[in-house]
Amino acid sequence: MEVENVSVTFGSGATAVEAVKNCSLTLHEGEPIGIVGESGSGKSTLARVMAGLQPPSAGQIRFRGDNVFKGNKSFQSGNRNQVQMVFQDPYGSLNPQLNGLSAVAEAVRIHSKVGKDEAEQKALELLERMGIGKLDALKKPRQLSGGQRQRVSVARALSASPTVLLADEPTSAIDQSAQAQLLKLFLGLLNDGLSIVLVSHDLGVIRYLTKRVYVMKDGVFVESGDTETVFNDPQEDYTKMLLASIPGELGKAARAKLKR
């Protein structure tokens, strides 16, 4: 996937807000990359554009050579299922009237055009892979923990057999134990060849999972590169400021660089 000089503007005239400004990036097959920045930096808007959910005001997204947005449609040549997204609030993205099994089975039927029994069997397999057993699979979203809801959301996304998964702040609304489970799950998906774009303000999560990182401020990429290089030798003051907020040696080193 290539993001080429993408900008996104909301509104017009004097009230126009440019949320994303001339951003470019490349995502390789089977690669984990991170987009990091504070709230309001534009990272979630860019993720929605990459997922085909928000058209850019300028620039283009290319997936396997095709322009994702063409006219009023997104993802030409049957590539719609290949890029999926999970959101920060799993409760808001799940139908409150459906239990986990039904929610995932519904997605399986949409993407695979199979019968009810086959869809439920596939859904059970996906949920079990996510660490959701049959008893929990029969619970509705309000009966599940935040971490369980997020894993049901991931199972729904995987029902399309995607090659790219965009995850927008997937760990921000869950506890530390659930975060660890979800990150372990993502590592397994990477081992299976899935490409992951992790959007987060949590630098620890970004460092744990990604190989390359893009640092975003006010809609602009201010720094990018190999994750370890950016974290250990940041060049931009904004990146240093973000890193300085981390407890421990990495944050201490970043704070020292800010004082220079």
Where are the regions that the model predicts?
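ABC ATPase NBD coupling module
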Residues: 14, 68-84, 98, 102, ...
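Helix-to-loop junction immediately C-terminal to a conserved catalytic motif
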Residues: 51
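Conserved ABC transporter NBD signature motif
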Residues: 59-70
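Conserved ABC ATPase "signature" region
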Residues: 118-135, 243-244
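Conserved ABC ATPase signature
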Residues: 140-144, 148
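A short, surface-exposed alpha-helical micro-motif characterized by mixed small hydrophobic
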Residues: 206-208
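ABC ATPase "signature
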Residues: 224-225
